[in-house]
């Protein structure tokens, strides 16, 4: 008896490949119908923080974009990667505490986040700060986790580089700027009152001389002596 295999068309193979690829990679629709954040996440984080050495070195991103919707989710993505890394070097007791915290932020793996960009810079800090920031992000995200769609947050973004930022102060446009009058020298300001006083004194002296030479109404002007009169006076 011969059993015939079903005939598979190229379209069928293509559909199967699409289904497999979508199942292997995270969904592009980053939204949550039910809150993945438990009500006692702060207790789990505090228990881990109390057990860990407070000065255990980790790294946090220093130039993540301050995006209102995506910023908190991006920091949880990086924190979740640290939880996975710490579990590989922790003892059995520590692994249990790390796994409890990791469970609280593991929901970020349900979204197909892109690898961190090369522009992202990291600075060293201690584990207590990382856990504190994780708790703060969960507190801020919990009321909105089921109300927002985070599909546009799948690519972590860096802050603009300092070389591309505008200067901290820039002058107004020329058409909106009134021309500035040149500042007079200080010496000119000091000499100006003296010059005005001298000018006033000269004017008063000139006025007094003019007044003496001008006869008043009814006043007789003495005749100007002739040369003969001057000779008689001399003899």
UniProtKB/Swiss-Prot annotation:
Residues 1-26 form the signal peptide. Residues 27-184 are extracellular. Disulfide bonds join 30-111, 70-153, 119-158. GO terms for biological process: B cell differentiation; dendritic cell differentiation; embryonic hemopoiesis; positive regulation of cell population proliferation; positive regulation of natural killer cell proliferation; signal transduction. Residues 213-235 are annotated as: Disordered. Residues 206-235 are cytoplasmic. Glycans are attached at residues 126, 149. The chain crosses the membrane at residues 185-205. InterPro entries: 4_helix_cytokine-like_core, Flt3_lig. GO terms for cellular component: cell surface; cytosol; extracellular region; extracellular space; membrane; plasma membrane. Keywords: Cell membrane, Cytokine, Disulfide bond, Glycoprotein, Membrane, Secreted, Signal, Transmembrane, Transmembrane helix. One of its GO terms (molecular function) is cytokine activity. Stimulates the proliferation of early hematopoietic cells by activating FLT3. Synergizes well with a number of other colony stimulating factors and interleukins. Required for the development of B cells, and dendritic cells (DCs). Homodimer (isoform 2). It is linked to Immunodeficiency 125: An autosomal recessive immunologic disorder characterized by failure to thrive and chronic diarrhea in infancy, and recurrent bacterial, viral, and fungal infections. Patients have severe human papilloma virus (HPV) infections with disseminated common warts, and the bone marrow is hypoplastic with low levels of CD34+ hematopoietic stem cells. Counts of B cells, monocytes, and dendritic cells are low in patients blood. This is Fms-related tyrosine kinase 3 ligand. It comes from Homo sapiens (Human). The gene is FLT3LG.
């Amino acid at each position: 008896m011969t059993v015939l295999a079903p005939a598979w068309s190229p379209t069928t193979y293509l559909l199967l490949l699409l289904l497999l690829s979508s199942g292997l990679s995270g969904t592009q629709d980053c939204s949550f119908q039910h809150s993945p954040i438990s009500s006692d996440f702060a207790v789990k984080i505090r228990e881990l923080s109390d057990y860990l050495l407070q000065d255990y070195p980790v790294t946090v991103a220093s130039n993540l974009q301050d995006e209102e919707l995506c910023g908190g989710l991006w920091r949880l993505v990086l924190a979740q990667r640290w939880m996975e890394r710490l579990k590989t070097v922790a003892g059995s007791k520590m692994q249990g505490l790390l796994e409890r915290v990791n469970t609280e932020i593991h929901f970020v793996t349900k979204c197909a986040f892109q690898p961190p960009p090369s522009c992202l810079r990291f600075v060293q800090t201690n584990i207590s700060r990382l856990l504190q920031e994780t708790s703060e992000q969960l507190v801020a995200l919990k009321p909105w986790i089921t109300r927002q769609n985070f599909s546009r947050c799948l690519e972590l973004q860096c802050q603009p580089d300092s070389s591309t930022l505008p200067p901290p102060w820039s002058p107004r446009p020329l058409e909106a700027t009134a021309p500035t009058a040149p500042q007079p020298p200080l010496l000119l300001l000091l000499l100006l009152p003296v010059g005005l006083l001298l000018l006033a004194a000269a004017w008063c002296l000139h006025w007094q001389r003019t007044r003496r030479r001008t006869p008043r109404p009814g006043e007789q002007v003495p005749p100007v002596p002739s040369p003969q009169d001057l000779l008689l006076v001399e003899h």
